[in-house]
């Protein structure tokens, strides 16, 4: 009886640990809303899918993809997206740094710039962002 009780307690604790990890992991589909800096005016919504292999992609913006890194509640994700007229390669580099505030929500700062490009940059934009968890299933990349 004691052994069965010990196994049951261990199973409950393991389930709670996995549940806590799932709440803080960014893996899954997120609604990404970003806002102009300065001013705070709304700019756009996108859908981002964070994958278990530490890569991500957009299911709403064609070709936008990259890699992500998490340290505790800090999340950094960077990548690139084809953008006609942006720099000599028609490409934007992107980076976001934020925090997982509570389960299902994160926010931070986001920037995009023409890459490669001569200074002064022809495209250099800065935003704040919020993200809301949509679910474990991601739509296909656009």
Q: What are the functions of these language-model segments?
A:
Residues 40-80:
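N-terminal glycine/threonine-rich, aromatic-flanked beta-hairpin/loop signature
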Residues 1-4:
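Positively charged n-region of N-terminal signal peptides that target proteins for export
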Residues 19-31, 47-51, 135-142:
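N-terminal helix-cap/turn-to-beta initiation motif at the start of protein domains
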Residues 15-17:
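N-terminal signal peptide c-region/cleavage motif recognized by signal peptidases
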Residues 11-12:
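Repetitive helical segments and hydrophobic/amphipathic motifs
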Residues 31, 49, 67-69, 99, ...:
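Generic structural detector for well-ordered beta-strands
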Residues 34, 40, 74-142:
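Beta-sheet ligand-binding and adhesion/scaffold domains
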């Amino acid at each position: 009886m004691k052994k069965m009780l010990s196994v049951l307690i261990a199973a409950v604790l393991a389930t709670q640990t996995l549940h806590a990890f799932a709440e803080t992991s960014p893996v899954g589909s997120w609604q990404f809303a970003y806002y102009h800096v300065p001013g705070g005016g709304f700019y756009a919504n996108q859908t981002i899918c964070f994958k278990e292999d530490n890569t991500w992609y957009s299911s709403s913006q064609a070709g936008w993809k990259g890699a992500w890194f998490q340290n505790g509640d800090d999340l950094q994700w960077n990548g690139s997206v084809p953008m006609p007229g942006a720099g000599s390669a028609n490409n934007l580099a992107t980076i976001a740094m934020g925090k997982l505030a509570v389960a299902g929500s994160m926010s931070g700062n986001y920037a995009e710039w023409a890459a490669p490009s001569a200074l002064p940059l022809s495209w250099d934009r800065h935003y704040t962002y919020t993200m809301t968890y949509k679910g474990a299933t991601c739509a296909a990349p656009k």
